[in-house]
């Protein structure tokens, strides 16, 4: 409960990567269509901040879906893979995979910007939301405060956020 944040990395081999290297298949999601990182980064910006991520989570009884998303960025590596960096104070169940899945649906043209905006403005579970496969997801870093602040941070982490605390989209 003392962590102040976590960073996940998700790896995608899209159509621009000219096929999936067999050595990468165990930790990379193969998406046949080309993805435009600049367009995905622009769309991802609207998800940043303290908000209700119910549309992108599998809710757990008694838990909040309000989280502070600090970074959601798509970068093409030298090898042609796309690395998605996702940083938040905490994550709901399936949140990273749901966010990546939703943005890939948008990036491949299977969903439009209005659909993505609707997920943000009106949080709620949608059965058709694509969950990105788990094998391409890795926990990269956990952030902690100075040891003398562990107790304070643990209290903040245990406090359940309420709907009125989330920013409006």
Briefly describe each language-model feature range.
Residues 1-169:
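Structured-RNA-binding interfaces characteristic of tRNA pseudouridine synthases
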């Amino acid at each position: 409960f003392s962590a102040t944040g976590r960073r996940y990395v998700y790896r995608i081999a899209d159509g621009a990567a000219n096929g999936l290297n067999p050595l990468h298949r165990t930790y990379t999601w193969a998406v046949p269509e080309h993805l435009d990182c600049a367009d995905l980064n622009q769309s991802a910006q609207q998800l940043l901040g303290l908000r209700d991520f119910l549309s992108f989570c599998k809710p757990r009884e008694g838990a909040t879906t309000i989280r502070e998303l600090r970074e959601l960025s798509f970068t093409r590596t030298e090898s042609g893979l796309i690395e998605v960096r996702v940083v938040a104070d905490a994550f709901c169940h399936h949140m990273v995979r749901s966010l990546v899945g939703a943005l890939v649906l948008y990036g491949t043209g299977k969903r439009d910007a209005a659909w993505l905006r609707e997920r943000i403005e009106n949080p709620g579970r949608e059965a058709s939301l694509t969950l990105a496969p788990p094998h391409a997801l890795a926990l990269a870093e956990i952030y902690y405060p100075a040891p003398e602040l562990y107790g304070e941070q643990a209290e903040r982490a245990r406090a359940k956020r309420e709907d009125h605390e989330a920013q409006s989209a």
